[in-house]
Amino acid sequence: GIGFVPWGPVARGYFGDKFNEYSRFSDESRHNSVDSFSPEALERNRALLDLARIWSNRKDASPIQFSLAWLLAQRPFIVPIPGTTKLHHLKEDLGALDITFTEEELQEFRQQLESIDLAGVRSFESSLEDQ
């Protein structure tokens, strides 16, 4: 079998709820190289974070934990690996393992997710364009 490791399972910290349309990044920030962190995209994509917040509250979890748990629930061969350099982030990430979903919940979330019109090019897509 082949495993699948999703790129950026916590969206470069976006699900940490510390960015919004007023966020500005230093010239050295990795966020400057990603379309989805432009002010316009952050404003438009707020609906995704709002949806993650609603569901994370339902699951008594953080949006980051919800994001990781949802990815884990998709298929047994999907293995999200969030990069972290801080112990408290690792502990938060591990909390995703305690979250479960019913098939009905997964279907409901998927329908809500598909109704959101996201802005910005995904990181790997912009990398491919440079080739």
Predicted feature descriptions by range:
Residues 4-6, 80-83:
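Hydrophobic faces of well-ordered beta-strands that scaffold small-molecule active sites
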Residues 14, 89-92:
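Phosphate- and divalent-cation-binding pockets in alpha/beta enzyme and binding domains
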Residues 22, 81, 121-122:
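Short, hydrophobic secondary-structure boundary micro-motifs
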Residues 47, 61, 85:
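Residue-level signal for the nucleotide or nucleotide-sugar donor/cofactor binding architecture
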Residues 69-70:
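Hydrophobic, secondary-structure "cap" segments at the distal end of domains
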